[in-house]
């Protein structure tokens, strides 16, 4: 009789992984979960300090979210969303309208983060075509940016790990050198930063603004690049530059939204309103695949016309606006409000920052500890003074990942950047456990 792991390997091709590596881990088959913990079929627990790809916002099997989904399941599980609607979607849009940055008024429902980005790109392009800006056909993005795995989303990303193979298929866009506050080429520090690097954006807009429909950006935090955090002032300057060149600004809040950066949305920290905003991951508490592209009224108005004019936005997904996902999202908003989650998370973040500094601040291979909200990242380097990274071929982060799994901690390093991105309501005992197990794993792999 084959084991459950052997049955998995026989048929399943897992995402974002080299299956030969996966075979050697060995595979972990999760049976159940509670709070920040996952438990495999053998009863072993794993502390999910990365919120299962940054999606689990309020803990696994949260009782309030469970109850809301269960109640909806007995009424309506799904319905076509083209020319039909339902209460959960209407209520969710109404609630979000009071929470998103001022000026964002219309909500287009999609299936997942990549599809929200695809919708935003198509909306921006079509908006320009339908408002007399027909020469604006390209997009701008930041180097090291990540916006999803579909072809359009890859085209506005800049990470070769995901995109190199598919470049012949991709759109030709303008990639702007992103801020790198740890290894600032201008010799500035986070405390002295004047955003000198913004000159790259200014040059790009001067050369290409006339042909650019939209600029897409992960506000304040480039997640997949290694939890790279950049200044709020950079985002404010980018908003002004887009306005000056009649370029739409798309904020990809898929990873940063719903409290991850200490505010409900990262754009709030900079006090800006994008023209389009993409939401997913924490939107449903990590329960259901759902996303929303939120836009300003002027975007919506450019599509509103008689059918004969051919201006409708014909982008659709089968499970757009799914009632179960909308119900989960409504429960998330209730919990955030009723349990003062953001305020409590801010207190936890301050405590965690001190604990991370205490535990890793003097480590000879820790180049920088950076954080925004509850997200904390530790960048490992071979030479701390020179900020020289380890040879990528060593796969140090992956080795620590494997070691941590043996100790019951789920990390998912970004290269040699180890990070915490836990549920917002995680307890301090769990965070202490995560710190201890991460340090143990680092020291074992580094031979300290």
Please tell me what each predicted stretch does.
Residues 1-448:
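Conserved N-terminal phosphate-binding loop of PLP-dependent enzymes in the Aspartate aminotransferase
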């Amino acid at each position: 009789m084959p084991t459950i792991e052997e049955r998995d390997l026989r048929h399943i091709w897992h995402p974002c992984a080299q299956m030969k590596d996966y075979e050697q881990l060995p595979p972990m088959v999760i049976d159940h979960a509670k709070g920040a913990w996952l438990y495999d079929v053998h009863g072993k627990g794993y502390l999910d300090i990365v919120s299962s790809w940054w999606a689990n916002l309020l803990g696994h099997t949260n009782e309030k979210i469970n109850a809301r989904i269960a109640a909806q399941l007995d009424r309506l599980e799904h319905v076509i969303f083209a020319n039909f609607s339902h209460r959960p979607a209407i209520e969710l849009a109404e609630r979000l309208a009071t929470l998103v940055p001022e000026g964002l008024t219309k909500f287009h429902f999609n299936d997942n983060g990549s599809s929200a980005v695809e919708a935003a790109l198509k909306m921006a392009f079509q908006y320009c075509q339908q408002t007399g800006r027909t020469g604006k056909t390209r997009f701008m993005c930041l180097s090291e940016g990540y916006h999803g795995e579909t072809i359009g989303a890859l085209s506005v990303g800049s990470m070769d790990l995901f995109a190199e193979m598919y470049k012949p298929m991709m759109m030709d866009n303008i990639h702007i050198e992103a801020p790198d506050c740890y290894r600032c080429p201008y010799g500035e520090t986070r405390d002295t930063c004047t955003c000198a690097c913004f000159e790259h954006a200014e040059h790009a807009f001067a050369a290409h603004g006339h042909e650019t429909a939209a600029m897409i950006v992960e506000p304040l935090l480039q997640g997949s690049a290694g939890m790279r955090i950049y200044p709020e002032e950079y985002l404010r300057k980018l908003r002004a530059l887009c306005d000056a060149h009649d370029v739409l600004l798309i904020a990809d809040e898929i990873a940063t939204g719903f409290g991850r950066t200490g505010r409900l949305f990262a754009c709030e920290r900079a006090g800006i309103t994008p023209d389009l905003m993409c939401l997913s991951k924490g939107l449903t508490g990590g329960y259901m695949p759902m996303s929303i592209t939120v836009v300003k009224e002027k975007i919506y108005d450019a599509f509103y016309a008689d059918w004969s004019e051919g201006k409708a936005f014909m982008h659709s997904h089968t499970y757009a606006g799914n009632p179960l996902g909308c119900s989960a999202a409504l429960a998330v908003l209730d919990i955030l409000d009723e349990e003062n989650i953001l305020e409590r998370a801010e207190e936890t973040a301050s405590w965690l920052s001190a604990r991370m500094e205490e535990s890793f601040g003097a480590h000879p291979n820790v180049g920088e500890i950076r954080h925004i909200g509850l997200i904390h990242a530790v960048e490992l380097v071979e030479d701390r003074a020179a900020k020289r990274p380890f040879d990528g071929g060593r796969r140090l982060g992956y080795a620590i990942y494997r070691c941590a799994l043996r100790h019951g901690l789920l990390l998912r390093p970004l290269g040699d950047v180890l990070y915490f991105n836990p549920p917002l309501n995680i307890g301090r005992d769990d965070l202490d456990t995560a710190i201890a197990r991460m340090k143990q794993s680092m020291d074992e792999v580094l031979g300290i």
